[in-house]
């Protein structure tokens, strides 16, 4: 019988079973062979014939404690090997109940069995919640557009019952963020530049175009509005940023400001910090007109940079004096020889008041002057009064004035 039992054990070791973990240690194996053959009648015949190595596991009444201690010692030293075997070799369906019923109250759960159960329990919610938030989840990954199948949407409470169950199981792995691609971020930023708030049809359209869900687009716009609000309050509080001399610096401002009919509206919107005062008036026509005026501003700024190089040199000597206000009398009193030439070039519009006959070269020559004297906090009274009063500009003057406003820092103006 002993020889036959050894042959059976060798056969069972060649296939995955629960008994391999119990009989793979030689010291434990020899202790089984003396005691378990006598008491092998405890196991019912079907289990004994199909799985013969269960009889030493379950019927060894006098030696369960020594076996458990040796098994625990060996599993501590060979923990990785035991854990890998337990993970790779699932037990047959009829085997675990037989071990539990036969061993019964005399033997507790083995350590590797506990590890297997806990890893199963934690891997199921972890894998499903991790799979619910891929790096770029397609729109078909969630069961419905309104269900919260995404772990990245971290603002609102889940509306799906299965997701709520997953959150209860794996609460530590839920707060994952969606990684947007550069293309998606660019399109979302463009849309946010023109519309701070999206209606639902537009949100569905953007989600379909960018391969996102409607919930992800909504949450991104909520976060972006909060970021815009923080940026606006920070700029109003500090007021010392010189980084908006180019047209790209006006990205956080409202999309409807550049297309407003009066020139004082962009100044008031940026000066008072009311970031949501004119959000309802942004429509596609005004957005297109704002993009046209932005392109016009960029081209005008480039022309001003080409034409105004000698003018910057001329004004660098007089920038400390009051000639930076573009008054002709104080400029001619200064000892600089190039200052009258400079003021002759900028003569048609000394203070940007209501002059209809201003030409584009004179305006582009005045662009570097504006960027230089905008660093001083004082302005001429005529310019300030003309800014406060809404004036009916022609279309040409309005384009010129909009492009000029896009090149100076509006935070230094006193209202």
Curated annotation (Swiss-Prot):
Pfam families: Homeodomain (PF00046). Residues 43-171, 225-360 are annotated as: Disordered. Keywords: Developmental protein, DNA-binding, Homeobox, Nucleus, Transcription, Transcription regulation. Transmembrane segments: none annotated. InterPro entries: HD (IPR001356), HD_metazoa (IPR020479), Homeobox_Antennapedia_CS (IPR001827), Homeobox_CS (IPR017970), Homeodomain-like_sf (IPR009057). SUPFAM superfamilies: Homeodomain-like. GO terms for cellular component: nucleus. Residues 173-232 bind DNA. A motif (Antp-type hexapeptide) lies at residues 109-114. Residues 96-107, 138-154, 268-288 have a biased composition (Low complexity). This is Homeobox protein Hox-B2a. It comes from Takifugu rubripes (Japanese pufferfish).
